[in-house]
Amino acid sequence: MYVVKVYEEDSGGYLYVGQIKGKFLTYEDAKIKIENQNHWCKHKFYFRIEEVI
């Protein structure tokens, strides 16, 4: 299982702002979700996929 954490660029680096709702079975599913988010997102967010144990 994977989760997608969302960060925003800050003057001191990256600031954690939250997590995309849901858990994903595969890394590829998580990547697709990120690509869909980027289509409508107007802010400069950065996404990180993390495996949940």
Task: Go through each PLM region and give its residues.
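N-terminal acidic leader/helix
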Residues: 1-21
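Short, mixed-charge low-complexity intrinsically disordered segments
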Residues: 8, 17-18, 35-53
